[in-house]
Amino acid sequence: MERKQLHIMAIGAHVGDMELTAGGVLAQHAAMGDKITIVNMTPGEKGNPPHLTVEQYAEQKIREAREFAEMLGGQSIVLDYKDGELPDTDEPRFRVADLIREHKPNILITHWKNSMHKDHSTTSRIVVDAQFYAGIKGFERENPAHFAGGPYFAENWEDPYDFKPYTYIDISKGYLLWVEALKKIWFVTNSTSFKYFEYYDALSKIRGCEARKSRAQAFAVDPLSMKQIKESF
């Protein structure tokens, strides 16, 4: 039976978040012929290096997001909220819900809810509610209701509190593409505050060992999704 094409939408707080934490899975699905959309709520511009202004770094990160997505044959959407100032209101929730209705993904990926970074926690709450708003036809918007599966919560060193890996995705076929695409994002290999590439590369190896694969990325799920319903053992 021919496999049905999937559409994966990863929604992060800043350019680089989903590209690092779920990028291997996105590359894996791209290699399988699936459709990829990466949404960033902000560029993540306030971590600007000394040689760039905040405004210049925002422009650079928007370009980096586009180049990363294009390497996967996907699309990038960077919203115009400000880094560190993402509002925890219904306005961004309905904005994301509208994107879900417009692009009709099968699966959502976002941040785990408990983070040291307020934008990450806020994005997680936004996506959970946006999934609900997008799927209920009683919320009348420009496009008809669409329910997307998930969300799956990506593993991020800044979102560690109570994170429990539950779903492991083999990224062996997408690993090299992911590594090449990450070279488009400046801070991944140039940050002096944290060794981003080394951390996430090593983490993919560790999760791969746990999954008995060469490389993997792991995701948490809502506790309600862990229920098993069987007729018998």
Please name every model-derived segment.
Residues M1-E102, S232:
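Active-site rim/loop-helix segments in enzyme catalytic domains that contact anionic ligands
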Residues E2-I11, P87-F233:
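Metal-dependent de-N-acetylase/amidase catalytic core
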